[in-house]
Amino acid sequence: MDSLSDIDGDFDGRNEGGSSSDYRLLGRQITVHQFMGGGKAADLLLWRRRHLSLGVIIISTVAWLIFEFSGLPFLSVSSDVLLIVIMISFVHARVSAFRNRQLHSLPELVLSEEMVNSAAASFRIKLNHLLVMAHDVTVGNDFRLFFKVVICLWLLSAIGSYISLCTLLYIGTILSVTIPALYSKYQSKVDKCCGTIHRRLSHHYKIVDENVISRLSWSLSKDKDS
């Protein structure tokens, strides 16, 4: 969340008259790989591990086709898949033992205490941030935030009326695997285009803010005082 706040601050720090060629979507001194954490997940999303990235797309596509067109419930399909995998592994182990063949050692899946504490701390910070936002929206302290939340929820409602949750998750997975890699490849062109769009949107938002939002906020605060 801190990185997103830094980006928002970077947006606000640019004046409207700035050139779109100077615009940087992720900041001036950060790469896409660094912005995404620089770990194995970033390597996967940026196609530095092509076989894993391609595997994610294939598995996501197969899963989407199964759940979307078969009509089978998620719990039933997941249980059947796990059952088949466990049975195959068990039979393979028994056959190998019967033939006195050595099994390939499987890696142990163990979460370290440091990893769990780090994930819990990160989740706590993000959850507290969301709770603060929810409090500000419900009590009416920040009208601009309320306006943004209403627009986002309305868009989600409109999208959800046409697209199922399974399809929405599939689209999100495909976009998360393709967009970062494409942006990393065409970063300069995308930054230039986004700079132009951002400058125009900032101009229109300034007009709406001065003529509508600021007046509504002033009238609401006046009603509270009275």
From Swiss-Prot:
GO terms for biological process: response to bacterium. The chain crosses the membrane at residues 54-74, 75-95, 149-169. Keywords: Endoplasmic reticulum, Membrane, Transmembrane, Transmembrane helix. It holds the Pfam family Reticulon. One of its GO terms (cellular component) is endoplasmic reticulum membrane. Residues 41-224 form the Reticulon domain. It is a multi-pass membrane protein. Disulfide bonds: none annotated. This is Reticulon-like protein B16. It comes from Arabidopsis thaliana.
